[in-house]
């Protein structure tokens, strides 16, 4: 789709970004983990769950069961992902409660922080490229308008 938009615009090097909040952010973690993307920025805000950087955790929460799971994991960690987290996104309304989700943490903020730290540690352990960033928006809960109008989002969008 991005290639089509670039061709139609006559700008073959036009950058593209993937941005999602809540369920949209959760979907983006799956896109980033399991599909090829040429996005120059991927901003994942407050998802209920993440794709963990683990070949021992089964799909859709990790890479176990995917063909070529380790190369996929390596590519995932090299993507330009910003984990944009609300500093007050600590509620449990509409939070995934499957055992695999609960294992990620008790709320979206905890899950995002833990996933980022695990991703950084795995990349460092293997000597792989790691292009993720973590940005927290203080005082904001599960609110896409406040998240995406924050200075942290502006920076994540490269504006």
PLM regions with names:
Residues 23-25, 88, 138-143:
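Short, internal active-site loops enriched in acidic
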Residues 25-36, 149-151:
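Short glycine-enriched nucleophile-adjacent loop
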């Amino acid at each position: 789709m991005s290639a089509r938009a670039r061709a139609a615009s006559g700008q073959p090097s036009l950058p593209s970004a993937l941005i999602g909040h809540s369920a949209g952010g959760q979907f983006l973690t799956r896109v980033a983990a399991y599909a090829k993307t040429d996005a120059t920025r991927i901003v994942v805000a407050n998802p209920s769950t993440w794709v963990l950087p683990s070949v021992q955790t089964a799909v859709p929460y990790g890479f176990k069961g995917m063909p070529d799971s380790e190369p996929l994991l390596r590519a995932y960690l090299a993507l330009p992902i910003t984990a944009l987290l609300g500093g007050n996104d600590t509620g449990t309304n509409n939070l995934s409660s499957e055992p695999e989700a609960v294992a990620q943490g008790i709320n979206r903020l905890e899950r995002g922080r833990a996933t980022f730290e695990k991703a950084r540690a795995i990349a460092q352990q293997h000597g792989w490229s790691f292009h993720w960033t973590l940005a927290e928006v203080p005082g904001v809960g599960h609110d896409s308008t406040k998240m995406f109008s924050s200075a942290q989002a502006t920076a994540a969008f490269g504006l």
